[in-house]
């Protein structure tokens, strides 16, 4: 499983729904959507600021989480930004290999 972070904003229609039914459990509904793609929300918080929520999600791959995003956005619930956790040490090792085989453009 890969670890992802999702930052999201809700649409005006979603806010209208919250006002009409302030008791709805948005975390449970989000978890059900994630589970449909064999993903699991391991943490979710609502925020003040540029984003309305942040979630930590474990999923098999990016495509499964992208399907969740498409569903969320297609229903006009809001917008999501998916960020994937990476192994920076492994990336640095690969960059070292790439660098040893790269010739930068000559500067004039």
Locate predicted features:
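A compositional/biophysical signature of low hydrophobicity enriched in polar/charged and small residues
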Residues: 1-108
